[in-house]
């Protein structure tokens, strides 16, 4: 039964995160960037839940912090949350990292489904900043796989509830829809069996 619940959680997580990505992309094309800013705070909590980090929004520490959006000083982690997933954006983010973050680990968090193209490139992080594009680009596909691989269903439940509480989704719950349809079909079959022709 836990395997079925795991799948239900993962399906809901994927639906909600991909819905967020679509909204961020479309709103970005329309130059409506409010969701980009709100997403930074969402990702602070999401990444802290998944990885056990202590990220804070860097923009609350310094208005429009260059190159980074999220900081965890105790674990020496930096992250850039963006609706843009290009090599140029990663290069620019790395270039803008202040020297005071020498030796920190940098994560690029594009709010897109799949940023696999960006993993193919070579990057030159400054100030001995650690950045491996194969493991440090946290797109939705990467994050969903990370959650899916968690051994503890209670952790997945916590993350799924956090996402559900933060991302409203107009996609109907197919599990409830299917069980509702099954009920209607069984009732119709029962009613039809009572009709004598």
Where are these regions (language model features)?
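Charged, low-complexity surface segments at secondary-structure and domain boundaries
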Residues: 1, 27-31, 127-129, 144-145
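Acidic-basic catalytic patches of nuclease active cores, encompassing PD-(D/E)XK
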Residues: 2-58
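Short secondary-structure transition/capping segments
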Residues: 8-12, 102-114, 153-166
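Generic hydrophobic, helix-prone segments enriched in Leu/Val/Ile
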Residues: 14-21, 90, 180-184
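Catalytic centers of nucleases
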Residues: 34-98
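Catalytic cores of nucleic-acid endonucleases
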Residues: 82-141
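Charged, structured surface patches that assemble and position nucleic-acid processing machinery
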Residues: 123-193
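Conserved small/polar residues in nucleotide/adenosyl-binding loops
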Residues: 195-197
């Amino acid at each position: 039964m836990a395997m079925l619940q795991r799948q239900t959680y993962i399906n809901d997580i994927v639906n909600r995160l991909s819905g967020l990505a679509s909204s961020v992309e479309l709103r970005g094309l329309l130059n409506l960037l409010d969701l980009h800013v709100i997403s930074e705070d969402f990702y602070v909590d999401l990444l802290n839940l998944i990885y056990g980090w202590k990220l804070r929004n860097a923009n609350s520490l310094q208005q429009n912090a260059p190159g980074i959006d999220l900081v965890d000083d105790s674990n020496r982690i930096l992250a850039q949350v963006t609706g843009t997933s290009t090599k140029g954006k990663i290069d620019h983010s790395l270039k803008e990292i202040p020297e005071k973050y020498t030796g920190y680990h940098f994560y690029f968090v594009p709010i897109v489904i799949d940023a696999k193209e960006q993993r193919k490139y070579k990057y030159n992080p400054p100030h001995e900043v650690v950045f491996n594009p194969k493991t440090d680009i946290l797109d939705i596909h990467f994050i969903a796989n990370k959650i899916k691989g968690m051994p503890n269903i209670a952790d997945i439940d916590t993350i799924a509830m956090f996402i559900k509480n933060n991302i409203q989704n107009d996609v109907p719950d197919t599990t409830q829809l299917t069980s509702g349809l099954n009920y209607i079909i069984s009732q119709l079959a029962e009613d039809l069996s009572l009709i004598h022709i």
